[in-house]
Amino acid sequence: MDYIQEYVKPVDPEVAEAIEKEEARQNNKLELIASENFVSRAVMAAQGSVMTNKYAEGLPGARYYGGCEYVDIVEELARDRVKEIFGAEHANVQPHSGAQANTAVYFAALQPGQTIMGMNLNHGGHLTHGSKVNISGKYFNIVDYGVNRDTERIDYEELREIALKARPQMIVAGASAYPRILDFKKFREIADEAGALLFVDMAHIAGLVAAGLHPSPVPYADFVSSTTHKTLRGPRGGFILCRQEWANKIDKAVFPGIQGGPLMHVIAAKAVCFKEALTPEFKAYQQDIVNNAAILAKALMEQGLRVVSGGTDNHLMLVDVRPKGLNGRDAEAILESINITVNKNAIPFDPEKPTVTSGIRVGTPAVTSRALKGDDMRELARAITLVLDKHDSEEVKEEARRIVKALCDKYPLYT
């Protein structure tokens, strides 16, 4: 990128070199990490703008600093657009991350020591849904639910039984590694029966929800959180949607509760991202993500890999690599050696340690942003299975690298 050469390199050549190498890495490798994506140039430019210079504690029209008239415009645009996308009553776009958005929801609605029921991390949940190493697991009493051993899908009757026994104050629906549709209507019914609030973390599926390709949680949930940088294809950040009755508590939980000044350059980029998400092109892009995931999952299964739950309904899949005599850690390293990036990931009822795992998580948002489709995904599956089958063969690795290079050359980034 020319501006790195022009502005950064003369001042800090070490940082400039690292940025240039990262740009080359993104260009020359195929990104299959489900939580990563490539923003548009418009989003990137907004995030790199003079908005980074402005402090703006508070909310539009009620700041603790002067000179906020233009950052107010940007934040209002971001709030209005995200409410339009999801049909929400209230939005707060200030959370710096999905984790901070989730923490704000907990502290807006609960008292320390109350009970949260969330999806088990080892079954596809997220750290912020009650893991003992996270603040959510330290401040609150956690009860978890998971997937059925046979179907590897959420068993809603079992979930109901756990909820009625535990009587949590809040049920969290959402996941970081669950490839199937979430039934928010059932979650709502269970929450009502158990006397619990319903909080949905839609970080992974927000883009699909925006495009109407996954049921929306907004009509059912008391609170909805998300990141902006996964399927939404925006900057790294978070937001919260809620019913109007919770608006004041949510806003106060974000500021001054867990954050100080908002990152106005990031909020500007969020506003641009939300405008892009309102276009027909964005909906077509989300359909391509889902189609690509289905094609890739089918191709991997046809070539001897086991995909958890037998496929995917969304943008990601969990691949059990044990049929190839591998663990997730080794599979991740092998694929990295041919310029495909994935992450090792636990599969349900995984006998391996979290640092080893039996599977890998594979997602299609980033490769879809590069415009890969159909036969490209089948070629990608061929490269993956070639090298996992014969990972000790340098000849096979070279063949797989040629497949990856051809796809990268065909679909360059930021041309």
From Swiss-Prot:
Pfam families: SHMT
Pathway the protein acts in: One-carbon metabolism; tetrahydrofolate interconversion; Amino-acid biosynthesis; glycine biosynthesis; glycine from L-serine: step 1/1
Subcellular location: Cytoplasm
PROSITE patterns: SHMT
Residue numbers carrying N6-(pyridoxal phosphate)lysine: 230
Cofactor dependence: pyridoxal 5'-phosphate
A biological process term (GO) from this entry: glycine biosynthetic process from serine
Chief place where the protein resides: cytoplasm
PANTHER family: SERINE HYDROXYMETHYLTRANSFERASE, SERINE HYDROXYMETHYLTRANSFERASE 1
Complexes and interactors: Homodimer.
Functional summary from the UniProt entry: Catalyzes the reversible interconversion of serine and glycine with tetrahydrofolate (THF) serving as the one-carbon carrier. This reaction serves as the major source of one-carbon groups required for the biosynthesis of purines, thymidylate, methionine, and other important biomolecules. Also exhibits THF-independent aldolase activity toward beta-hydroxyamino acids, producing glycine and aldehydes, via a retro-aldol mechanism.
Name of protein: Serine hydroxymethyltransferase
Taxonomic placement: Bacteria, Bacillati, Bacillota, Clostridia, Eubacteriales
